[in-house]
């Protein structure tokens, strides 16, 4: 590189660095005007700034008036002429009235700036949330692959809240303080430039301390937040997958990880508290030291004036300067600046940092943007071939692990192409590349000869439909979910107004209220009727219309979040209907019928092949019987194409495909392949069984939704009302282990409260000592003595604040840590039914751990320390005032009820506002979280604009309601701020009257005045802190209710219950190890079991079920989707309890026994393979028996048996490879095999397999079966399966239909005598 180029590069580097510095310096200003503010926003911003600045002027004006009053009082004290008394009183009355006028102006200005900033902050938060949400909808899939679990939800909640807090009324408070600061210095220099100049040294001292203290505070706060975010992610995954956590009793392992992260946060939080404590102590030390300096220097000026007889420098003038630059800062800025402005700087910085992080995501230009509309670069030929030319691909999160390696393939237009192969061979990746969810690393994907990178993404996706391996539905009605497939259809653009205007939602609501679907359609117009007709036709094609017709609400039925209220098979049918409704030119099916039983699958497959005749169809499948009629079958292995051809050609070549077919062939004798007419009749009845089962399955899930609508039972709900006394009583055991630090904190807080009144005594005597009635030497002597007293108070204040803030911070972090750990434990101890009812979503439950845990600082942290100091000062000030001058004190205290009343109303209205605010935006938040969780589905269907419109509609009502509530709540805040000014006017008027009358001296008056002035200011501050206390009490009540549930509804076995009086410190410690159990199979019996979900007692999911499995048997459960098979597994795990009958394991009724320690002998592999964020080693180890930490050898053995060990060791980091949030860094087959390894590492006596190999190819499945046979010798195994070849060797197969066991026997026996079983088997056979 040449010298010139090096200089150029260095210059560019400096320029980039300068730009970053400028952007960082201006980020807060950019935040205020970000996201296209409207005229209303700009008006609110302008009003807020001007009113806040103007509100800083009245108090300095009062300083001038107070100085004049001091001169008046001095004159009255020195002059005993009674005739002059009335003249002095008249002057005092005039000035007191001016204080009233100034107070009224202050109240009006405060209300304007608080209301303006609050409303501005609320509107900015909504704009940012929408802008960030809109940017998320633009991002490509790779962006979300690298996003930790729950981060998007956290950004949309806590991060936006952080920004809102940093752009609301706190900005006005700081502007008010800065305005006061500037105005005070201007007046001070005008009044006495010399003394003002001497006190300028305060400013750099404050700035230096704030900068250094702020650096360390921010450093520790960032470390704390990082660890809290990590712990929240662990909790979110655990709450979202409560079934797995319960089944493996994995509470302790996840709790250990959760507590470890919180432990790090606790250490950082304590260091942050110490940093803030030092900062607070130094601020008061500087202020009181400056007070002493000012009075000492001021006394010299006054003494010189008295000695020279020069009236130019009066006590009032000196008092004005000292009051504005020192005392005013103590009583005004330092009360609202030390305790508020300094922390506010951190709040603003946090808002700026958070905004910068959000802005980076918002401004991120996605490589694939599916939101751009227009006809430019549209797909010209929609009937051309799809080709992959030398395509290589690796996921951005793992660039060193290629998924596709130089792949070339062609999918002919108008034909059916099938892609098969081993798990992890890249089949689903091909589908993602064709739909342009990702772009290839090398090579190109072309559609009709056009590179799809050159095409408009929406245009490309408008001509295809993708049904993914794990279908995702939105929390809407069946009607709306299917109609979503029409959103970006080029042939149905005329239907857009009806699709996007909310009409379908209104129709679905009407149907749920008993109205007829077609009548409602006609009412809403021809376009709507056309949409509904197309939806019904698509449902027919997807074999979904029958089960939809059986539902009470039909097409108006809500499917729940992510389709949680319907079965997997029903979700797949609705997803297929959604993809077929627009009759796409290209249909991509990625294991689209894997969750269906064979009969349903056969019908759906036939319907798809019929409707896609002459169109392009790409199928990805592991069930090879579903693709044997394909025009071309492409076989993949390890990211490469190994062979292709028709089914017969590939069988003839006897290659990899033929081997897979042989592995899946069922053992059916040739003579049994001829199906009689009676068999076909039986097939019809079998179809009826399927539909009944589907209806029952949906009923059981909808029962959970019904339960949610009923609301929580106060006797068993975390939101139950709790009395204040019982809440306070429960705080005692929490604080008991920390009594030493609590004693230090309380003692220090008492000292802080006492020093305020002590400073009033010193101040009053100082004013009296500097009276011009005294000699110059006496004034100088008083200045030195009382200056020293202020310095002593400064030292006391430093150590008292240091002790109070650090000790209360230490206690707060300890309590927060324990409460969060115990809350997590209590949540995970509740049974599955509790988690799935009463609207207890993982997000809602997580808020107890995060928001409620954090809110407790209002009862244990610096907030409560400040309030205690204020209350102590209140008592001392009132007592001192009555002792010194009770006549003055009584009148001044007359306004206290008004102040307290305003403060109480402020707390009440603010609490109500916060509760309504949280409820108002629940729906909109739910939309954003759901969209992020279903982002691939939204991208594939081009739903970004529709989702954004739905989000905006959800905000209209809440935004107006919140604005009205905010205006009312802020009125009381302004009153609580402004009422203290009227105390000043009353105090000076009445005090002057008493001094002129000779009842009290000037010293007595100023002691009472300063004591009550400080109290008045502190009371105002206490009311600003009161919402924190209110939030803390609400949060504590919820937490205590939750901990109470831990002792009443616990199903998690031998952990110590949280009984009253138990040591919470001990409760938060890790649990004791459980003893290992003996090996060998165990018996399982279900005796006349009936089961209904409590909210739907009239719907029997299981109806008199009898099953008996001997120790060591391999038992299988088969039957149509929704027949109750998975419910049986849930009952065996005691995730639910039977309505009647009993479940016996090893001869013991598990419903009658206490605890669930029997689960130690059971391992469970769910249908949906769930992994947690963490390493492969961590995830497999979660399956170990509680209290046992598996060795590396045990983990590797389990992985070998699950046929995943070789895959793991080929990864760059081996067993230390991070699985990613919800295991998103692994393929479906890899996740499933790890889930099996997790079960096998337990070495259970009973192994439960629920469709545990549905995501595996035939070869992987065969190897896994061999491993399972080896691992489960002597073990009892219960397997649920749709693929009958996986359970051919079962000792006994139970045929479950309509909640009953209709037959049992071996595979050969059931093929011989059960027509429904034989038909199912024939559908899966090749020959």
UniProtKB/Swiss-Prot annotation:
Listed GO CC annotations: mitochondrial inner membrane
Residue span, ABC transmembrane type-1 domain: 47-326, 743-1031
Gene Ontology BP term (one): oligopeptide export from mitochondrion
UniProt keyword Signal present: no
Residues engaged in binding ATP: 421-428, 1119-1126
Location(s), subcellular: Membrane
Topological category with respect to the lipid bilayer: Multi-pass membrane protein
Keyword list, A-Z: ATP-binding, Glycoprotein, Membrane, Nucleotide-binding, Repeat, Transmembrane, Transmembrane helix, Transport
Occurrences of domain ABC transporter (ranges): 386-663, 1084-1323
Triggers of expression: Expression is induced during iron deprivation.
Chief place of localization: membrane
Membrane-crossing segments per the record: 47-67, 100-120, 170-190, 195-215, 228-248, 276-296, 743-763, 785-805, 859-881, 888-910, 971-991, 1005-1025
Keyword Repeat: yes
Record: glycosylation sites: 381, 390, 406, 463, 674, 1050
Location of the region described as Disordered in the Swiss-Prot/TrEMBL record: 1054-1081
GO terms of molecular function: ABC-type oligopeptide transporter activity; ATP binding; ATP hydrolysis activity
Family: Belongs to the ABC transporter superfamily. ABCB family. Multidrug resistance exporter (TC 3.A.1.201) subfamily.
Functional description taken from the UniProt entry: ABC transporter; part of the gene cluster that mediates the biosynthesis of hydroxamate-containing siderophores that play a critical role in virulence via intracellular iron acquisition during macrophage infection. Probably involved in the excretion of the extracellular siderophores.
Name this polypeptide is given: ABC transporter 1
Organism: Ajellomyces capsulatus
Phylogenetic lineage: Eukaryota, Fungi, Dikarya, Ascomycota, Pezizomycotina
Gene name for this UniProt entry: ABC1
């Amino acid at each position: 590189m040449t010298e010139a180029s090096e200089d150029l590069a260095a210059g560019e580097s400096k320029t980039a660095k300068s730009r970053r510095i400028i952007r960082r310096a201006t980020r807060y200003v950019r935040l205020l005007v970000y996201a296209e503010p409207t005229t209303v926003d700009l008006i609110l911003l302008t009003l807020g700034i001007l009113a806040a600045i103007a509100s800083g002027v009245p108090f300095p004006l009062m300083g001038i008036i107070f100085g004049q009053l001091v001169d008046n009082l001095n004159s009255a004290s020195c002059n005993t002429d009674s005739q002059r008394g009335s003249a002095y009183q008249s002057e005092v009355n005039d000035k007191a009235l001016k204080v009233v006028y100034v107070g009224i102006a202050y109240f009006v200005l405060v209300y304007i700036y608080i209301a303006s900033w609050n409303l501005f902050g609320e509107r900015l938060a909504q704009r940012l949330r929408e802008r960030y949400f809109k940017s998320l909808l633009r991002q490509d899939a790779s962006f979300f692959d690298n996003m930790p679990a729950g981060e998007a939800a956290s950004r949309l909640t806590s991060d936006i809240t952080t920004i809102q807090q940093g752009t609301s009324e706190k900005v006005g408070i700081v502007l008010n303080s800065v305005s006061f600061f500037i105005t005070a210095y201007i007046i001070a220099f005008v009044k006495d430039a010399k003394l003002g100049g001497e006190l300028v040294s305060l400013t750099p001292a404050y700035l230096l301390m704030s900068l250094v203290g702020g650096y360390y505070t921010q450093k520790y706060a960032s470390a704390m937040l990082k660890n809290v975010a990590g712990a929240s992610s662990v909790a979110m995954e655990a709450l979202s997958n409560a079934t797995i956590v319960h089944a493996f009793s994995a509470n302790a392992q996840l709790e250990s990880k959760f507590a470890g992260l919180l432990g790090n946060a606790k250490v950082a939080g304590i260091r942050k508290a110490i940093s803030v404590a030092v900062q607070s102590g130094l601020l008061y030390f500087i202020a009181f030291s400056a007070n002493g300096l000012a009075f000492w220097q001021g006394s010299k000026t006054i003494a010189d004036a008295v000695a020279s007889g020069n009236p130019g420098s009066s006590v009032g003038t000196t008092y004005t300067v000292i009051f504005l630059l020192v005392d005013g800062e103590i009583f005004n800025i330092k009360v609202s600046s030390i305790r508020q402005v300094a922390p506010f700087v951190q709040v603003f910085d946090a808002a700026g940092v958070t905004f910068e992080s959000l802005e980076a995501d918002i401004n991120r230009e996605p490589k694939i943007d599916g939101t751009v509309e227009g006809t430019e670069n549209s797909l010209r030929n929609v009937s051309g071939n799809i080709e992959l030319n030398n395509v290589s691909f690796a996921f951005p999160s793992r660039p060193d692990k290629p998924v596709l390696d130089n792949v070339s393939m062609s999918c002919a237009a108008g034909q059916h192409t099938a892609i098969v192969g081993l798990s992890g061979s890249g089949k689903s990746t091909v589908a993602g590349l064709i739909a342009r969810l990702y772009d290839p690393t090398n090579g190109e994907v072309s559609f009709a000869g056009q590179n799809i990178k050159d095409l408009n993404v929406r245009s490309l996706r408008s001509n295809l439909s993708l049904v993914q391996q794990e279908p995702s539905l939105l929390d809407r009605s069946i009607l709306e979910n299917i109609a979503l497939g029409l959103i970006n259809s080029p042939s149905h653009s005329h239907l857009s107004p009806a699709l996007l205007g909310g009409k379908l939602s209104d129709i679905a609501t009407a149907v749920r209220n008993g109205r007829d679907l077609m009548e409602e359609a006609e009412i809403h117009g021809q376009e709507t009727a056309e949409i509904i007709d197309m939806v019904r036709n698509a449902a027919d094609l997807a074999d979904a219309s029958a089960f939809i017709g059986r539902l009470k609400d039909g097409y108006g039925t809500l499917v729940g979040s992510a389709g949680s209220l319907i079965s997997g098979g029903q979700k797949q049918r609705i997803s297929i209907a959604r993809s077929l409704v627009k009759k796409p030119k290209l249909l991509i099916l990625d294991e689209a019928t894997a969750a269906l039983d064979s009969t349903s699958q056969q019908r759906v497959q036939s319907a798809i092949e019929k409707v896609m005749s002459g169109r392009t169809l790409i199928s990805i499948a592991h069930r090879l019987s579903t693709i044997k009629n394909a025009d071309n079958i492409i076989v993949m292995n390890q990211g490469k194409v190994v062979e292709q051809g028709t089914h017969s050609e590939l069988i003839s070549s006897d290659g990899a495909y033929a081997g897979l077919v042989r592995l899946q062939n069922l053992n059916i004798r040739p003579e049994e392949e001829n199906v009689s007419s009676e068999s076909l009749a039986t097939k019809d009845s079998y179809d009826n069984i399927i539909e009944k089962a589907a209806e029952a399955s949906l009923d059981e899930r909808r029962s959970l939704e019904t339960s949610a609508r009923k609301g929580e039972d106060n006797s068993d709900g975390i939101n139950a009302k709790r009395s204040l006394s019982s809440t306070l009583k429960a705080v005692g055991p929490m604080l008991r282990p920390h009594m030493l630090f609590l004693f230090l904190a309380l003692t220090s807080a008492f000292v802080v409260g006492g020093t305020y009144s002590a400073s009033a005594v010193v101040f009053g005597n100082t004013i009296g000592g500097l009276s011009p009635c005294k000699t110059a030497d006496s004034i100088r002597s008083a200045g030195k003595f009382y200056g020293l007293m202020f310095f002593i108070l400064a030292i006391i204040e430093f150590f008292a604040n240091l002790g109070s803030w650090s000790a209360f911070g230490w206690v707060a972090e300890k309590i927060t840590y324990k409460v969060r750990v115990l809350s997590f434990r209590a949540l995970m101890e509740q049974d599955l039914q509790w988690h799935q009812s009463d609207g207890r979503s993982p997000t809602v439950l997580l808020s107890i751990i995060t928001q409620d845990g954090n809110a407790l600082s209002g009862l244990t942290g610096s907030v409560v320390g400040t309030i205690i100091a204020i209350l102590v000062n209140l008592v001392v000030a009132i007592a001192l005032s009555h002792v010194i001058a009770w006549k003055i004190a009584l009148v001044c205290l007359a306004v206290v009820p008004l102040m307290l009343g305003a403060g109480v109303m402020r707390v009440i209205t603010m609490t109500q506002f916060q509760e309504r605010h949280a409820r108002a935006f629940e729906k909109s938040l739910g939309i954003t979280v759901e969209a992020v969780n279903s982002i691939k589905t939204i991208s594939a269907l081009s739903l970004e604009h529709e989702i954004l419109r739905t989000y905006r509609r959800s905000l209209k009502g809440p935004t107006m309601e919140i604005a009205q509530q905010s205006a009312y709540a802020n009125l009381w805040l302004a009153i609580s701020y402004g009422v203290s000014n009227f105390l000043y006017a009353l105090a000076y008027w009445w005090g002057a009257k008493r001094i002129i009358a000779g009842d009290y001296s000037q010293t007595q008056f100023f002691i009472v005045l300063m004591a009550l002035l400080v109290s008045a200011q502190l009371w105002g501050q206490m009311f600003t802190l009161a919402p924190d206390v209110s939030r803390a009490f609400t949060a504590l009540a919820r937490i205590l209710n939750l901990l109470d549930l831990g002792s009443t509804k616990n199903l998690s076995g031998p952990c110590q219950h949280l009984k009253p009086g138990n040591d919470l410190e001990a409760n938060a410690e890790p649990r004791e190890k459980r003893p290992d159990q003996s090996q060998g199979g165990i018996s399982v019996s279900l005796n006349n079991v009936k089961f209904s979900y409590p909210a739907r007692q009239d719907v029997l999911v299981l109806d008199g079920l009898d099953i008996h499995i001997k120790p060591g048997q391999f038992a299988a459960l088969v039957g149509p989707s929704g027949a109750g098979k998975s419910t049986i597994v849930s009952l065996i795990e005691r995730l639910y309890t039977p309505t009647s009958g009993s479940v016996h394991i090893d001869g013991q009724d598990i419903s009658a026994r206490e605890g669930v320690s029997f689960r130690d002998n059971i391992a469970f592999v769910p249908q949906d393979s769930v992994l947690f964020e963490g390493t492969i080693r961590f995830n497999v180890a979660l399956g170990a028996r509680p209290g046992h930490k598996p060795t590396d050898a045990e983990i590797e053995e389990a992985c070998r048996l699950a046929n995943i060990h070789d895959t793991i060791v080929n990864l760059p980091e081996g067993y230390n490879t991070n699985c990613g949030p919800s295991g998103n860094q692994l393929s479906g087959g890899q996740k499933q095999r790890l889930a099996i390894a997790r079960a096998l590492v337990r070495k259970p006596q009973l192994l439960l397999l629920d469709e545990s190999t549905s995501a595996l190819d035939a070869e992987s499945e065969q190897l896994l079966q061999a491993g399972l046979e080896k691992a489960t010798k002597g073990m009892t195994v219960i397997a649920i399966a749709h693929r009958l070849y996986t359970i051919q060797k079962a000792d006994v197969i139970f045929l479950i239909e309509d909640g009953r066991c209709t037959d049992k026997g071996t595979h050969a026996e059931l093929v011989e005598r059960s027509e429904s079983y034989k038909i199912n088997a024939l559908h899966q056979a090749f020959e």
